[in-house]
């Protein structure tokens, strides 16, 4: 009986197309090429590449920021409000900390809880300190740590396709989404 099952399994594998056996390599221009280990708000180990297969909004922030970073979150929430339930289910929102010294998973979870972020769609990530600059470079975020521990930084939402390629970017933040960027989000979700 075991031999028969093994033979059937072998035959099925032989009939599968090669694409079904191995995932295609990442595109050369994919942000997911950056192999930076991180932990999420639940302390689970992850990388950017685990977001593959789902359109993403990505930004960088830090949890102790009182001014601009809350607007980054507001911007993600405002975009979500403009989406249908089906569109929302196909979108992920990823916020990457630029302050891993202070932004441990507990700090990330406090922000997610306080802001009532749906963790089926939102992911807050803590990279290793040595990877912050590379991550910022990939997403076009400039930052500088100040003497008081705060950061000067560009604030942007970056739209990625399901393969991690940058499709669009906006620096318009707040409760009213950038209409051109929102149209790009909807287009990316429709082509998915």
Residue spans of the language-model regions?
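Thiol-/selenol-based redox modules, centered on thioredoxin-like
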Residues: 146-192
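A short beta-strand-turn-helix
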Residues: 36-56
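Structural microenvironment flanking redox-active thiols in thiol-disulfide oxidoreductases
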Residues: 73-135
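Bacterial N-terminal signal peptides
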Residues: 6-17
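Short active-site neighborhood of thiol/selenol oxidoreductases, capturing the structured segment around
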Residues: 49-72, 76
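Positively charged n-region of N-terminal signal peptides that target proteins for export
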Residues: 1-4
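N-proximal helix/coil linker or "cap" segments that precede and/or mark the start of modular domains
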Residues: 19-34
């Amino acid at each position: 009986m075991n031999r028969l099952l093994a033979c059937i399994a072998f035959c099925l594998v032989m009939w599968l197309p090669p694409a079904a056996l191995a995932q295609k390599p990442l595109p050369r221009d994919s942000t997911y090429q950056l192999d930076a280990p991180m932990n999420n708000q639940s302390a689970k180990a992850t990388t950017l590449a685990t977001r593959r297969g789902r359109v993403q909004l990505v930004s960088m922030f830090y949890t102790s920021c009182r001014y601009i970073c809350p607007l980054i979150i507001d911007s993600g929430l405002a975009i979500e409000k403009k989406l249908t339930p089906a569109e929302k289910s196909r979108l992920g929102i990823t916020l990457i900390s630029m302050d891993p010294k202070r932004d441990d998973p507990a700090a990330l979870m406090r922000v997610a809880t306080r802001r009532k972020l749906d963790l089926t769609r939102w992911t807050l990530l803590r990279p290793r300190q040595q990877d912050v600059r590379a991550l910022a470079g990939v997403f076009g975020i400039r930052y500088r740590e100040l003497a008081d521990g705060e950061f000067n930084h560009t604030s942007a939402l970056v739209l990625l396709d399901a393969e991690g390629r940058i499709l669009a970017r906006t620096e318009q933040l707040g409760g009213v989404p950038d209409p051109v960027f929102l149209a790009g989000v909807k287009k990316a979700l429709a082509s998915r």
